[in-house]
From Swiss-Prot:
UniProtKB keywords: Methylation, Ribonucleoprotein, Ribosomal protein, RNA-binding, rRNA-binding
Biological role stated in the UniProt entry: One of the primary rRNA binding proteins, it binds directly near the 3'-end of the 23S rRNA, where it nucleates assembly of the 50S subunit.
Stored HAMAP family: Ribosomal_uL3_B (MF_01325_B)
GO molecular function: rRNA binding; structural constituent of ribosome
Chain intervals for the UniProt region annotation (Disordered): 132-155
Superkingdom as given in the UniProt entry: Bacteria
Residues where N5-methylglutamine is found: Q152
A GO cellular component entry from the record: cytosolic large ribosomal subunit
GO BP annotations listed: translation
Coiled-coil regions, chain positions: none
Name of the protein described by the UniProt record: Large ribosomal subunit protein uL3
InterPro entries: Ribosomal_uL3, Ribosomal_uL3_bac/org-type, Ribosomal_uL3_CS, Transl_B-barrel_sf
Origin species: Legionella pneumophila (strain Lens)
Protein family per UniProt: Belongs to the universal ribosomal protein uL3 family.
């Protein structure tokens, strides 16, 4: 099973193909990830590798967490993620994994992150509801959702009803994005299209589960 890496979204730009076609790409900075723990089926019930990225001030790390990183003889990170693996033999605590070890240009990846938070939003913005009439007897009800239920039967609002509420700041995964370029010198990945999150936010990049690179 392939593992992924942790990185930070830098922003978006574009690159040009040899034919002169403009390709929009998201730039992700992926500094070498460090293995903080290797979980085994014998000790933990399943096999997984735990990675950390970035650097966190020692004053911001609790003693139990500091001891966890010290056991692997690595600096405390400000990002952490776990990937399931088939065999623990390829990983050891303290091991450093770079972008060139996992990704190659042309393959497809899945990117997970937190979407931009939009705060409290109405149904028009949050769920793409249509607005009501601007005139013809409509008074101050242009953006209201309308009826949210039936009558005495069932006498309640069904779960999952689309209503106003908090929008964004939710985990989201965009699948099967093409990896345009891997810049191992600057620890950058150029991924075709948009990915979740604001610039500077944490993202997880994994080999795509539904699509392989061209020619494979």
């Amino acid at each position: 099973m392939m593992i992924g890496l942790l990185g930070r979204k830098i922003g978006m730009t574009r690159v040009f193909t040899p034919e002169g076609v403009s390709v929009p790409v998201s730039v992700v900075e992926v500094h070498p990830n460090r293995v903080s723990q290797v979980k085994t089926a014998a000790n933990d019930g399943y096999s997984a590798v735990q990675l950390t990225g970035g650097i966190k001030k020692s004053s911001k790390v609790s003693k139990p967490v500091a001891g966890h990183f010290a056991k692997a003889q690595i600096d405390a990170g400000d990002m952490q993620v776990e990937f399931r693996i088939d065999s623990e033999d390829a990983f050891t605590p303290g091991q450093v994994i770079s972008v060139a070890d996992v990704f190659t240009a042309g393959q497809y990846v899945d990117v997970s992150g937190l979407t931009k938070g939009k705060g409290f939003a109405g149904t028009v913005k949050r769920h793409n509801f249509r607005t009501q009439d601007a005139s013809h007897g409509n008074s101050r009800s242009h953006r209201v959702p309308g009826s949210i239920g039936q009558n005495q039967t069932p006498g309640r609002v069904f779960k999952g009803k689309k209503m106003a509420g908090h929008m964004g700041n939710a985990r989201c995964t965009i699948q099967s994005l093409e990896l345009v370029k891997v810049d191992s010198e600057r620890n950058l990945l150029l991924i075709k299209g948009a990915i979740p999150g604001a610039p500077g936010s944490r993202v997880e990049i994994k080999p795509a589960v539904k699509k392989q690179a061209r020619g494979e």
